[in-house]
Design a protein with these regions (language model features):
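Hydrophobic ligand-binding cavity/cleft-lining segments
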Residues: 1-46
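Short beta-edge strand/loop motif at the mouth of beta-sheet-based domains
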Residues: 13, 33-72, 157
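Short, conserved beta-turn/loop elements at beta-strand boundaries and strand-helix junctions
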Residues: 85-90
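A generic structural micro-feature
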Residues: 6-8, 53, 71-75, 101-105, ...
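Generic C-terminal helix-cap and adjacent flexible tail
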Residues: 8, 151-158
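Beta-strand/loop substructures that line and gate deep hydrophobic ligand-binding cavities in soluble
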Residues: 91-143
Length: 158
């Protein structure tokens, strides 16, 4: 697993090799039930309200805190799919639903899937991270989420 973050550009890049074929890993980003099962970082659960996996399609979801100290946490967000190439690349926008000025703005997330001898190298590049979120926290969140994704898709009979 590799990762880097930049406070200057408000961006992060995280990579991980997942022992599964690119198409299986790609599909886990676009299946609502599967996406909700791995995307929220530890301490959170997610509900996907809608997900239209087509160019120009939109998605909306909410993260909920599931631990005592996070019990009151609820954050909704969504965006639009800009590019979808099965097993190769996903590009989408992402924006939080918040009145807080430090949470404003649209992020762009680019995910690439490259077949490697051990499976698939997944690289996530997220840019335009809101002021309220330190890029190091976004990096940690993606690292955690990709770890959960690996557990789920690697545990499927090929």
């Amino acid at each position: 697993m590799t990762g880097e973050s930049s406070s200057e550009t408000r961006s992060v890049t995280v990579s991980r090799v997942i022992e599964a074929p690119p198409e299986r890993v790609y599909d886990a980003f676009l299946d609502p039930e599967m996406f909700a099962s791995w995307y929220p970082p530890t301490g959170y659960t997610a509900e996907v309200h809608h997900l239209e996996p087509e160019v120009g399609g939109t998605y909306r979801m909410t993260f909920y805190g599931d631990a005592d100290e996070l019990a009151d946490f609820e954050q909704s967000f969504g965006g639009t799919y800009r590019e979808l190439s099965r097993g190769e690349r996903i590009v989408y926008t992402d924006a939080f639903e918040s009145d807080e000025p430090t949470m404003a703005g649209e992020m762009t997330v680019t995910i690439t899937f490259v077949e490697v001898p051990d499976g698939t190298e997944v690289t996530v590049h997220q840019e335009g991270i809101p002021e309220a979120i330190p890029p190091s926290d976004a990096n940690a969140g993606w690292t955690d989420s990709l770890g959960t994704l690996a557990e789920i898709v690697e545990d499927v009979d090929a």
